[in-house]
Amino acid sequence: MYDTPTSWDKSLHVPADIQKIVDTVKSLEDDGVRAVVTACGFFSVVQEILADAVNIPVFTSPLMMVPQIVRLIGSDRSVCIITASERLLVSDYLVPVGIESNMPVRIVGMDSSAEYYATHMGGTRTTWDVDLQRKELIEIVKNAVLRFPDIGALLLECSQLPTFSADIQDAVKLPIFDYIGFIDMIYLAVVQRRYSGIL
């Protein structure tokens, strides 16, 4: 895992310390790691850079799942991406992982979540009220579903949000795709299970 970078090149939308990240991924490969996952969906901008640097799979962002989800839910439904900031998740982060402008995608930010912004996205508070966060996030998702009745699935872009996936699903009864499901898929790709018994 490589956490959210502290400094971004605003003009290129890539981490200012990209070479450090590349070196880290190479070091992990040298240590025998079979796949690398980053810990911020906004790392989609460096997917190609990191994948080209090593000979193991690199998965930078659950945003990579969006083109597949679009095909799963039918052409009359949309995928709703729940992200830290609707304003910040611009096409620079979408195009590198195959999200095209004509895809039925709704982007909904957590900008109204006071609890999230107190502890993430530059917030300095070190304690996280998980129950309050759950309540705020469910409210954001419920409002999104009311605003966009065509939503057929949700993608939680942030690595902190799978904590609440089951609660969100209970509230809106929709398929939820998140970082943990993404990682489970990756794990099974590089550590295949064995089958036995009557086949």
Predicted regions and their residues:
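N-terminal glycine-rich anion-binding loop in soluble enzyme alpha/beta folds
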Residues: 1-19, 85-88, 92-128
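A short, acidic, amphipathic alpha-helical segment used as a generic capping/interface helix at domain edges
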Residues: 133-150, 163
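Metallocofactor- and cofactor-centric catalytic cores in central/energy metabolism, strongly enriched
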Residues: 1-39, 49-51, 144, 150, ...
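Gly/Ser/Thr-rich loops at beta-strand to alpha-helix junctions
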Residues: 35-47, 58-65, 84-88, 157-163, ...
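Conserved beta-strand elements of the Class I
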Residues: 78-82
